[in-house]
């Protein structure tokens, strides 16, 4: 990978754009996930598109309206819609309705656990259904902004206004509250289970060290952070929201406390979405002008995957072994890169 300094034109970056298989989906995309050899592009409305290695497209209807959220564990893509349904689609394209809100409220957030459990939210209520089919719910102080399962144990983090709630659905007792003023819109546990980080409505992140609830202020962004991704092994948390990829260090016992983040792949426009390679210290970053870069985190070396002059990048994902990258912009122009 070659290096380009701040503002160094795209012509100075080594290009692998000729290795991308273009895919025209013809409709907006909100996220992309891999199920076996297929890239599954989640549309903004009603359906998902399965795209094979050759770029052939097959559509699967999943919702009777807008798709508001989606996650995947590599076995299924689970989505929530404004039709009040939580829907799963598997690698064979089989669709199953997992839950329907009794009041047909919008499903704002979904999360998946490794043992088959899943969570979803409608309004102020978070629901968990275990792998054995047992369902529990918890009401939090305000509308749920994000959900995430801890990497160990059945523990759910629920982001909301003025903080986050940590809930063990299988245990009695009061859930733990982590407070921080402002609206929290996304949430993630560090892979080692030691830290919790929320993305805020304002241009900042906020973190807590779970052992002692110590605060970690992660500010200085010019725009809201809409995308967060942990690097292989959880050493860094890469984020969008600035005119470079901001990567916060989490390898030490104090995480990013008292440390400056790395600033990778600077461009004159903001990063909109980030995705970390599952096995190596490499990330992919998409930008407002349609650029996609692959970045080596060790030294900032860059490869150009997609040139500028396109709509903002909306979705990025690696497959399980990191041999393929899928992307799409806000208008549905997509691509597959084989490495």
Positions of predicted regions on the chain:
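WD40-repeat beta-propeller superdomains and closely related acidic/aromatic-rich repeat-like regions
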Residues: 1-339
